[in-house]
Amino acid sequence: MAFALGQRWISDTESDLGLGTVVALDARTVTLMFAASEENRVYASNDAPVTRVVFNVGDVVECQEGWSLKVEQVVEENGLYTYLGTREDTEETGVALREIFLSNQIRFNKPQDKMYAGQIDRMDNFVLRYRALKNQYEQHRSPMRGLCGMRAGLIPHQLYIAHEVGRRHAPRVLLADEVGLGKTIEAGMIIHQQVLLGRAERILIVVPETLQHQWLVEMMRRFNLHFSIFDEERCVEAFAESDNPFDTQQYVLCSLDFLRKSRKRFEQALEAEWDLLVVDEAHHLEWSQDKPSRGYQVVEGLAERTPGVLLLTATPEQLGRESHFARLRLLDSDRFYDYAAFVEEEAQYAPVADAITALFSGVKLADEAKNQITELLSEQDVEPLFRIIESNADEESKAIARQELIDNLMDRHGTGRVLFRNTRAAIKGFPVRNVHLLPMPIPTQYTTSMRVSGMIGGKLAPEARAMKNLYPEEIFQEFEGEESSWWQFDCRVNWLLEKLKAQRSEKVLVIASRASTALQLEQALREREGIRATVFHEGMSILERDKAAAYFAQEEGGAQVLICSEIGSEGRNFQFANQLVMFDLPFNPDLLEQRIGRLDRIGQKRDIDIHVPYLQGTAQEVLARWFNEGLNAFAETCPTGRTVYDQVSDQLIEMLASGSNEALDDVIAESAKLNQALKADLEQGRDRLLEMHSNGGEKAQQIVAEIAAKDGDTNLVSFALSLFDTIGLNQDDKGENAIVVTPSEHMMVPSYPGLPYEGATITFDRDTALSREDMHFISWEHPMIQGGIDLLMSEGVGTCAVSLLKNKALPVGTLLLELIYAVDAQAPKRSGIGRFLPRTPIRLMMDARGNDLSGQVEFESFNRQLSPVNRHLASKLVSSVQNDIHRLIEAGDQLVVENVEAIRQQAQQEMQQSLNSELERLQALKAVNPNIRDEEIEAIDAQIKELNGYISKAQFQLDSLRLIVVSHN
């Protein structure tokens, strides 16, 4: 190692110091000054951990003054190099740059430059980088991209709808599933896919004010999508950053009332150019042909300006035909322009439904049914399919022929592409509800306080008095003070304590209307019996609620009881529990359904017990009996409840306010009759055809099977743990499928993407993640994995390595060079390039003669035979064979050209095949189904042309390389 003053070297152990200059020499030591980091280092001359920096012809080097030189010749004189070449800014030729004037901040971006400069990575980092490239490639190509990473059970109809809609260009659809079937999750899955595929970058969600937090939590917990709630206060704050506050965030959540009441904010929202608009509870938007409501006009204005629109609404039958038409008008006003024409067209779908029902049942088709199908599919020859169905062919062939006919008929179904609707009746897997009504005597303390309250509270409106009478404990506290212990004598509390003691192993969810009741109940359980309980109410932050929910979910040492207030429990689901206690009752049937829906959801494994303790002779008894006998709302979902309530509310409020229940039997009888009639109408209006289409049948099951197979991916676990190790995260295995990940002091970057400052508990198991809301569900799509991979790539981790191969069959010193190339098409994400040509790794294994052995030498098995080399020795090995490495890279560059051409051709072929078949299908359908929008066809046509250009220009570059040297010891 010969040093000379002015030479440039780089430290092998501290590469972040920059480029060093030899400033002093004596017999035994050498001093280097690193000007970029203002540090000096003194090393022993005979064994300094530094590498000489030499650039080659073709490299571009930077001068300290900031200009760059393309090297055409390298001259050495007295141990110092001078680079001759052309300046890139002025194009002046024959410029000489002495090495002492090279920029101190020089960075080695090419992997071979890093290798020559001694900046050699650990072998396991090289392996991690290659695996990251390979896995990213496979994830991008997967047809299930965007569906695997959400924290939700694998429920066929939800996944089918998300898969159908999420891949469309600017989807405009109506999601009208019945309550408890997970419309919010379907919408979230569609949003998630649109975001991952680059189709939607700016998203606006408009919901009723009470549901804002529920949406915020669901999007964050289930899909790792961080929305910002916008209200007047937030808009005023954001005004400092931008004239239009809506431009300050990509994902915005706001209430319809906020936009309805402020014309200024509505106009700003209109100007903000969204890619996707999501509207929840869209059935509350009132419309009539001559007088649409303000709320409807707000949504209509946004829907006209936004390419993608998702409307979440109650079932069409609950809405009524005209109201249902009004929702469809928001999606496509050209198509749904006239209500009368819509009604007439709907009537024509009856024969389609009959034909499909006949095909579904598998019975022999009558001539009439065949004629109907032939007429409906007039543009294609269906005779061969009929022949297969009626022949002696095997069952599978018959099923395929039937399915083809069904698919073709479905496509022609008027609203099949814009409307998805599932019912509990059409979807199996819901638990039975066991109802336990428990009448209890009213304590004398309550009787007294209620009588006094009635005497002095004469000014209250009937509705307010009715509400007040439902909560006798509050009336008692008005007289006895906030601190009075009503829970010492209330028989509902005594009953609850006995129940909890009798069923120690069962998790119990208790819901009370008020936060104060919930808090006092927790105190009662703790003080009277030492029962482990936790509370959940609207006064708590999202993080506090998460902790409470996690404590309740915990198997070992968790809370036996979770006590929720009405608002606090919105949007939270506790499917792992099956015992529900309603400590009091809500005022309206929708809230009752929402309470039961905390446990009675798709995915609940057991039947659920609903316990309703109520005080006899009080408003509670009136309500309990009306819900039970008038609506049967405890035992079954009650889509008609609200309508019945609106009809009988005056009599009901009168009884609740007065405490008299003489007319109760009559009101119950009237309600039951009305309920039956409404339910019969709903059943009559059910669109069987739409249900068949919405639940996805066999196709939905296949999607579930595919995602379930990916769920057990052990590759992901080992990859994630190596990734966290490399970046410098602490990992602590907590058992029960949980690992705690926290930032360390030795991290590669100051903060890790997707990881909170205090760390996070993660799990790779979907079921664990579903029962423990405090855990992150880690999948290939999770920001912690995606962000970690981006970090590896951008920080150049693992781009060059040196390994030893102990193999006595080969001569000592035999060289192999592993080259990893990446083929890349520079294209915007929204173009859809990722589906056909994502960043594609190509691996070559060059022997010393320049032959590629990658076909015979598989990466993982070969990697297991290699051992790492320390950086200093690696640097010496590289220096001794630098010319060979140069030669082999040139040979690799020539060899890889053929691979790149093959990859381009395959991508072109797949893209043409996939998009052209979709285009032809839509064009053929356009002739028979007006629901195909021109924009959709034009978008696919433009996409094909665009992608053709991008794919043909795809380039390759050397991403990483590994030198392998054979040794025998």
Curated annotation (Swiss-Prot):
ATP binds at D177, E178, V179, G180, L181, G182, K183, T184. Keywords: Activator, ATP-binding, DNA-binding, Helicase, Hydrolase, Nucleotide-binding, Transcription, Transcription regulation. GO terms for biological process: regulation of DNA-templated transcription. InterPro entries: Helicase_ATP-bd, Helicase_C-like, Helicase_RapA, P-loop_NTPase, RapA_C, SNF2-like_sf, SNF2/RAD54-like_C, SNF2_N. Pfam families: Helicase_C, RapA_C, SNF2-rel_dom, Tudor_1_RapA, Tudor_RapA. PANTHER family: DNA ANNEALING HELICASE AND ENDONUCLEASE ZRANB3 FAMILY MEMBER, SWI_SNF-RELATED MATRIX-ASSOCIATED ACTIN-DEPENDENT REGULATOR OF CHROMATIN SUBFAMILY A-LIKE PROTEIN 1. This is RNA polymerase-associated protein RapA. The lineage of its organism: Bacteria, Pseudomonadati, Pseudomonadota, Gammaproteobacteria, Vibrionales. The gene is rapA.
